[in-house]
Protein backbone atom coordinates (compact mmCIF):
# COMPACT_ATOMS: atom_id res chain seq x y z
CA UNK A 1 0.00 0.00 0.00
CA UNK A 2 2.82 2.38 0.84
CA UNK A 3 6.39 2.21 -0.46
CA UNK A 4 9.39 3.48 1.47
CA UNK A 5 12.56 5.08 0.14
CA UNK A 6 14.44 1.77 -0.18
CA UNK A 7 11.84 -1.03 -0.46
CA UNK A 8 14.48 -3.62 -1.30
CA UNK A 9 16.53 -3.04 1.85
CA UNK A 10 16.78 -5.75 4.50
CA UNK A 11 15.86 -4.55 8.00
CA UNK A 12 17.19 -5.68 11.37
CA UNK A 13 15.18 -4.58 14.39
CA UNK A 14 17.54 -4.11 17.34
CA UNK A 15 15.45 -3.93 20.51
CA UNK A 16 16.98 -1.29 22.75
CA UNK A 17 13.91 0.78 23.62
CA UNK A 18 11.94 1.88 25.50
CA UNK A 19 11.26 0.24 28.87
CA UNK A 20 14.94 0.08 29.74
CA UNK A 21 17.54 2.79 30.09
CA UNK A 22 20.30 4.38 28.05
CA UNK A 23 22.53 1.38 28.69
CA UNK A 24 20.08 -0.80 26.72
CA UNK A 25 20.35 1.57 23.76
CA UNK A 26 24.13 1.49 23.96
CA UNK A 27 24.14 -2.30 24.04
CA UNK A 28 21.96 -2.31 20.93
CA UNK A 29 24.41 -0.02 19.14
CA UNK A 30 27.30 -2.22 20.22
CA UNK A 31 25.44 -5.27 18.91
CA UNK A 32 25.34 -3.61 15.48
CA UNK A 33 29.10 -3.12 15.63
CA UNK A 34 29.76 -6.68 16.77
CA UNK A 35 27.51 -8.16 14.07
CA UNK A 36 28.36 -5.81 11.20
CA UNK A 37 30.13 -8.45 9.13
CA UNK A 38 27.87 -11.35 10.10
CA UNK A 39 24.69 -9.63 8.93
CA UNK A 40 26.12 -7.13 6.46
CA UNK A 41 25.02 -4.08 8.44
CA UNK A 42 25.68 -0.96 6.35
CA UNK A 43 23.42 1.57 8.07
CA UNK A 44 22.15 2.21 11.59
CA UNK A 45 19.28 4.64 12.15
CA UNK A 46 17.95 5.76 15.51
CA UNK A 47 15.15 8.15 16.36
CA UNK A 48 15.71 8.06 20.10
CA UNK A 49 16.49 11.18 22.05
CA UNK A 50 16.65 12.74 25.47
CA UNK A 51 13.75 15.19 25.53
CA UNK A 52 14.01 18.00 28.05
CA UNK A 53 11.88 20.77 26.48
CA UNK A 54 14.42 23.34 27.56
CA UNK A 55 17.75 24.75 26.47
CA UNK A 56 20.38 22.05 26.81
CA UNK A 57 23.59 22.53 28.74
CA UNK A 58 25.02 19.06 28.22
CA UNK A 59 24.42 18.24 24.53
CA UNK A 60 28.12 18.47 23.74
CA UNK A 61 28.56 15.01 22.24
CA UNK A 62 30.20 13.63 25.36
CA UNK A 63 27.31 11.66 26.84
CA UNK A 64 27.81 7.91 26.96
CA UNK A 65 25.29 7.13 24.24
CA UNK A 66 26.50 9.95 21.99
CA UNK A 67 30.03 8.53 22.18
CA UNK A 68 28.60 5.07 21.50
CA UNK A 69 27.01 6.36 18.30
CA UNK A 70 30.37 7.82 17.29
CA UNK A 71 31.80 4.33 17.77
CA UNK A 72 29.20 2.93 15.36
CA UNK A 73 30.45 5.33 12.68
CA UNK A 74 34.08 4.54 13.51
CA UNK A 75 33.23 0.88 12.88
CA UNK A 76 32.36 1.82 9.29
CA UNK A 77 28.56 1.96 9.64
CA UNK A 78 26.66 4.93 8.20
CA UNK A 79 24.55 6.34 11.04
CA UNK A 80 21.56 8.70 11.00
CA UNK A 81 20.14 10.23 14.20
CA UNK A 82 17.11 12.43 14.88
CA UNK A 83 17.63 16.05 15.86
CA UNK A 84 14.69 16.08 18.27
CA UNK A 85 11.28 17.78 18.44
CA UNK A 86 11.92 20.44 21.04
CA UNK A 87 11.79 23.74 19.18
CA UNK A 88 8.08 24.40 19.53
CA UNK A 89 8.26 28.03 18.46
CA UNK A 90 9.86 29.22 21.69
CA UNK A 91 11.86 32.38 21.01
CA UNK A 92 14.55 31.82 23.61
CA UNK A 93 14.37 28.09 24.26
CA UNK A 94 14.16 27.19 20.58
CA UNK A 95 17.89 27.23 19.92
CA UNK A 96 20.33 24.71 21.39
CA UNK A 97 17.63 22.04 21.59
CA UNK A 98 19.39 19.20 19.77
CA UNK A 99 18.71 15.97 21.65
CA UNK A 100 21.38 13.52 22.68
CA UNK A 101 22.57 11.35 20.96
CA UNK A 102 21.85 13.64 18.00
CA UNK A 103 24.66 15.82 19.32
CA UNK A 104 27.24 13.12 18.49
CA UNK A 105 30.21 14.24 16.40
CA UNK A 106 30.27 11.68 13.57
CA UNK A 107 26.71 10.55 12.69
CA UNK A 108 24.41 12.55 10.42
CA UNK A 109 21.77 14.39 12.46
CA UNK A 110 18.46 14.91 10.66
CA UNK A 111 15.99 17.81 10.91
CA UNK A 112 12.38 17.63 9.75
CA UNK A 113 10.58 19.36 6.88
CA UNK A 114 6.85 19.74 6.36
CA UNK A 115 5.27 18.45 3.15
CA UNK A 116 5.61 21.95 1.64
CA UNK A 117 9.38 21.63 2.33
CA UNK A 118 9.34 24.34 4.98
CA UNK A 119 11.24 23.61 8.17
CA UNK A 120 8.88 21.93 10.64
CA UNK A 121 8.08 24.18 13.60
CA UNK A 122 8.94 21.42 16.10
CA UNK A 123 12.32 20.47 14.61
CA UNK A 124 15.15 21.04 17.10
CA UNK A 125 17.84 23.59 16.24
CA UNK A 126 21.50 23.99 17.13
CA UNK A 127 23.99 24.98 18.37
CA UNK A 128 25.14 22.11 20.50
CA UNK A 129 26.32 23.25 23.92
CA UNK A 130 29.94 23.07 22.71
CA UNK A 131 28.98 25.41 19.82
CA UNK A 132 28.98 22.93 16.94
CA UNK A 133 26.47 23.41 14.13
CA UNK A 134 23.70 20.81 14.08
CA UNK A 135 21.66 19.32 12.42
CA UNK A 136 23.47 18.13 9.28
CA UNK A 137 20.59 17.77 6.80
CA UNK A 138 16.79 18.05 6.59
CA UNK A 139 14.26 15.64 5.08
CA UNK A 140 10.46 15.41 5.11
CA UNK A 141 9.17 14.23 8.49
CA UNK A 142 5.64 15.63 8.78
CA UNK A 143 2.48 13.67 7.96
CA UNK A 144 4.37 10.49 7.07
CA UNK A 145 2.32 7.31 6.71
CA UNK A 146 3.80 4.64 8.96
CA UNK A 147 2.75 1.23 10.33
CA UNK A 148 0.29 1.55 13.20
CA UNK A 149 1.60 -0.40 16.19
CA UNK A 150 -1.93 -0.68 17.57
CA UNK A 151 -3.06 -2.80 14.60
CA UNK A 152 -1.81 -5.82 12.70
CA UNK A 153 -1.74 -4.24 9.25
CA UNK A 154 -2.91 -0.64 9.60
CA UNK A 155 -1.17 2.64 8.90
CA UNK A 156 -1.29 6.00 10.61
CA UNK A 157 0.09 9.49 9.97
CA UNK A 158 3.06 10.50 12.11
CA UNK A 159 5.20 13.64 12.34
CA UNK A 160 8.59 14.33 13.86
CA UNK A 161 12.30 14.08 13.29
CA UNK A 162 11.71 10.41 14.16
CA UNK A 163 10.01 10.16 10.75
CA UNK A 164 12.58 12.26 8.88
CA UNK A 165 15.52 10.21 10.11
CA UNK A 166 14.52 6.79 8.69
CA UNK A 167 13.76 8.53 5.39
CA UNK A 168 17.37 9.75 5.36
CA UNK A 169 18.46 6.21 6.19
CA UNK A 170 16.47 4.98 3.19
CA UNK A 171 18.24 7.50 0.98
CA UNK A 172 21.52 6.24 2.43
CA UNK A 173 20.52 2.70 1.44
CA UNK A 174 20.06 3.82 -2.16
CA UNK A 175 23.49 5.42 -2.03
CA UNK A 176 25.01 2.18 -0.73
CA UNK A 177 23.26 0.30 -3.54
CA UNK A 178 24.93 2.67 -6.01
CA UNK A 179 28.27 2.25 -4.24
CA UNK A 180 28.55 -0.73 -1.87
CA UNK A 181 31.93 0.57 -0.67
CA UNK A 182 30.52 3.94 0.44
CA UNK A 183 32.09 5.00 3.73
CA UNK A 184 30.48 7.10 6.48
CA UNK A 185 32.95 9.89 5.71
CA UNK A 186 31.99 9.87 2.03
CA UNK A 187 28.31 9.78 2.98
CA UNK A 188 28.65 12.90 5.09
CA UNK A 189 30.81 14.65 2.48
CA UNK A 190 28.17 14.07 -0.20
CA UNK A 191 25.51 15.56 2.07
CA UNK A 192 27.72 18.61 2.61
CA UNK A 193 28.36 19.06 -1.10
CA UNK A 194 25.03 18.17 -2.70
CA UNK A 195 22.26 19.19 -0.29
CA UNK A 196 19.93 21.92 -1.54
CA UNK A 197 20.86 25.05 0.36
CA UNK A 198 17.88 26.62 2.11
CA UNK A 199 17.45 30.16 3.37
CA UNK A 200 16.28 30.70 6.93
CA UNK A 201 12.82 32.24 6.72
CA UNK A 202 11.86 34.30 9.76
CA UNK A 203 8.42 35.29 8.42
CA UNK A 204 8.01 37.88 11.22
CA UNK A 205 7.23 34.99 13.53
CA UNK A 206 9.33 34.37 16.67
CA UNK A 207 8.73 30.68 16.11
CA UNK A 208 11.08 30.88 13.15
CA UNK A 209 13.89 32.68 14.94
CA UNK A 210 17.37 32.48 13.46
CA UNK A 211 19.56 30.17 15.55
CA UNK A 212 22.56 30.70 13.25
CA UNK A 213 24.42 33.76 14.47
CA UNK A 214 27.45 33.52 12.21
CA UNK A 215 26.84 30.59 9.87
CA UNK A 216 25.35 30.68 6.41
CA UNK A 217 26.01 27.03 5.58
CA UNK A 218 25.73 24.76 7.39
CA UNK A 219 23.22 26.45 9.63
CA UNK A 220 21.48 25.41 12.83
CA UNK A 221 18.10 24.96 11.17
CA UNK A 222 18.60 22.97 7.94
CA UNK A 223 22.22 21.92 8.37
CA UNK A 224 23.72 21.77 4.88
CA UNK A 225 20.21 21.97 3.47
CA UNK A 226 17.39 19.90 2.09
CA UNK A 227 18.29 16.34 1.12
CA UNK A 228 18.55 15.77 -2.63
CA UNK A 229 18.21 11.99 -3.10
CA UNK A 230 18.95 12.00 -6.82
CA UNK A 231 22.12 14.05 -6.44
CA UNK A 232 23.22 11.99 -3.43
CA UNK A 233 22.84 8.68 -5.28
CA UNK A 234 24.56 10.01 -8.40
CA UNK A 235 27.50 11.30 -6.36
CA UNK A 236 27.80 8.04 -4.43
CA UNK A 237 27.86 6.05 -7.66
CA UNK A 238 30.49 8.28 -9.27
CA UNK A 239 33.20 7.90 -6.61
CA UNK A 240 36.33 6.61 -8.37
CA UNK A 241 38.96 5.33 -5.96
CA UNK A 242 41.52 5.05 -8.76
CA UNK A 243 41.66 8.87 -8.84
CA UNK A 244 43.90 10.32 -6.17
CA UNK A 245 44.34 14.09 -6.03
CA UNK A 246 46.56 15.42 -3.25
CA UNK A 247 48.24 18.75 -2.73
CA UNK A 248 49.90 20.63 0.10
CA UNK A 249 50.64 24.32 0.54
CA UNK A 250 54.40 23.95 0.09
CA UNK A 251 53.94 22.10 -3.20
CA UNK A 252 51.43 24.66 -4.46
CA UNK A 253 53.82 27.50 -3.71
CA UNK A 254 56.59 25.68 -5.53
CA UNK A 255 54.74 24.94 -8.76
CA UNK A 256 52.65 28.12 -8.95
CA UNK A 257 49.90 27.68 -11.51
CA UNK A 258 51.37 24.57 -13.14
CA UNK A 259 49.20 21.87 -11.58
CA UNK A 260 48.78 18.35 -12.92
CA UNK A 261 46.12 15.75 -12.19
CA UNK A 262 46.65 12.08 -12.97
CA UNK A 263 43.74 9.65 -13.17
CA UNK A 264 41.83 7.21 -15.31
CA UNK A 265 38.89 7.82 -17.62
CA UNK A 266 36.14 5.40 -18.52
CA UNK A 267 33.23 5.20 -20.93
CA UNK A 268 35.02 6.20 -24.16
CA UNK A 269 35.63 3.90 -27.12
CA UNK A 270 39.17 2.79 -27.89
CA UNK A 271 41.01 5.46 -29.84
CA UNK A 272 38.73 8.31 -28.80
CA UNK A 273 40.18 11.32 -27.02
CA UNK A 274 38.59 13.24 -24.19
CA UNK A 275 36.90 16.48 -25.21
CA UNK A 276 36.81 17.99 -21.75
CA UNK A 277 38.15 17.37 -18.25
CA UNK A 278 36.53 18.80 -15.15
CA UNK A 279 37.93 18.86 -11.61
CA UNK A 280 36.19 19.43 -8.29
CA UNK A 281 38.08 19.95 -5.03
CA UNK A 282 36.14 18.96 -1.91
CA UNK A 283 32.61 20.36 -2.01
CA UNK A 284 33.45 23.12 -4.51
CA UNK A 285 32.10 23.64 -8.00
CA UNK A 286 33.25 21.58 -10.98
CA UNK A 287 35.82 23.53 -13.00
CA UNK A 288 37.00 22.78 -16.52
CA UNK A 289 40.70 21.95 -16.53
Describe each PLM feature range.
Residues 41-45, 177-267:
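C-terminal subdomain of the subtilisin-like protease fold in secreted/lumenal serine endopeptidases
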Residues 286-289:
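Short beta-strand segments within Ig-like beta-sandwich modules, predominantly Fibronectin type-III
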Residues 25-29, 52-60, 82-105, 111-134, ...:
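Active-site-adjacent substrate-recognition loops and nearby beta-strands
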Residues 1, 12-18, 50, 139-217:
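Hydrolase catalytic cores
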Amino acid sequence: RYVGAAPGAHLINILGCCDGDIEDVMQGAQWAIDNKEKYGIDIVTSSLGEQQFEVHIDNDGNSAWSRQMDMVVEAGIITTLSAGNEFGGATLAGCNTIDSPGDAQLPVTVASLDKDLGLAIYSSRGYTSDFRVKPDVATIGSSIMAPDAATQDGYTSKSGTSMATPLMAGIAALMVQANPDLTPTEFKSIIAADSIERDIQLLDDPGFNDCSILESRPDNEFGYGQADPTAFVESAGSIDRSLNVSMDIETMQGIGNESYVHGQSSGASLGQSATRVEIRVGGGDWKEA
